[in-house]
């Protein structure tokens, strides 16, 4: 009899990454280590239906994420949403990733608190937990109250210990993260005003931004 294959634990962290910065990367690393993930995939959104249009081209955002995770164990890049010629709905991505995994493999969708509170506005949001667990990155300063639809969902699907989430999908749990006061909006504003963003983004990302003259104010 062949030995049973070990269950894989895969995470997905989506975002516009416009640009990717140390806040994204620190959260990704902390979740990966805390949850014992085999891999956490940073997944740049092409045309996110719930966000403003990214300021720079998809290929530049993808390249910056690749530069950011180069050589970082267990962090990787997934470009599938950039290959779609239509709005990038999370449910489509989860269905696609789930189809590539084994039936028992665990898939974790990592969301920030604000994104989680906005779930009822997402396309086919009620189906998300059919394909994954949801890990919510909780901040001490989070002040948004979840809508009633999510209160009901949390009552039914919440797991107090994220490391105890069992099965391939179906539960929600919270992971505390180290709050870093950095945002992509702040970085874009600094760059547009000609100021340095060193130490807010990895050196390789800064080098890419400078080489391609991204986020500069129009002349």
UniProtKB/Swiss-Prot annotation:
InterPro entries: Cyt_trans-like, NadD/NMNAT, Rossmann-like_a/b/a_fold. GO terms for molecular function: ATP binding; nicotinate-nucleotide adenylyltransferase activity. Pfam families: CTP_transf_like (PF01467). GO terms for biological process: NAD biosynthetic process. It comes from the Bacteria. It catalyses: nicotinate beta-D-ribonucleotide + ATP + H(+) = deamido-NAD(+) + diphosphate. Its EC number is 2.7.7.18. Pathway: Cofactor biosynthesis; NAD(+) biosynthesis; deamido-NAD(+) from nicotinate D-ribonucleotide: step 1/1. Signal peptide: none annotated. Keywords: ATP-binding, NAD, Nucleotide-binding, Nucleotidyltransferase, Pyridine nucleotide biosynthesis, Transferase. Belongs to the NadD family. Catalyzes the reversible adenylation of nicotinate mononucleotide (NaMN) to nicotinic acid adenine dinucleotide (NaAD). HAMAP family: NaMN_adenylyltr (MF_00244). This is Probable nicotinate-nucleotide adenylyltransferase. It comes from Pseudomonas putida (strain W619).
């Amino acid at each position: 009899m062949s030995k049973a294959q070990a269950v894989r634990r895969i995470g997905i962290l989506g975002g516009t990454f416009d640009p990717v910065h140390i806040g994204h990367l620190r959260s990704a690393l902390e979740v990966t280590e805390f949850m014992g993930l085999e891999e956490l995939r940073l997944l740049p959104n092409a045309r996110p239906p719930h966000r403003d249009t990214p300021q720079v081209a998809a290929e530049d955002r993808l390249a910056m994420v690749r530069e950011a995770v180069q050589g970082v164990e267990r962090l990787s890049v997934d470009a599938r949403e950039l290959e779609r010629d239509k709005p990038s709905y999370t449910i489509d991505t989860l269905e696609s990733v789930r189809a590539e995994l084994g039936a028992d493999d665990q898939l974790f969708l990592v969301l920030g608190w604000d994104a989680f509170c906005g779930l009822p506005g997402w396309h086919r949001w009620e189906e998300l937990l059919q394909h994954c667990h949801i890990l919510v990155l909780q901040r001490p300063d989070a002040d948004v109250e979840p809508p009633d639809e999510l209160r009901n969902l949390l009552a039914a699907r919440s797991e107090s210990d994220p490391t105890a989430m069992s099965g391939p999908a179906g539960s929600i749990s919270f992971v505390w993260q180290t709050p870093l006061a950095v945002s992509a909006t702040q970085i874009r504003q600094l760059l547009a005003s000609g100021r340095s963003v060193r130490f807010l983004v990895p050196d390789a990302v800064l080098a890419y931004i400078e080489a391609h003259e991204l986020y500069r104010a129009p002349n």
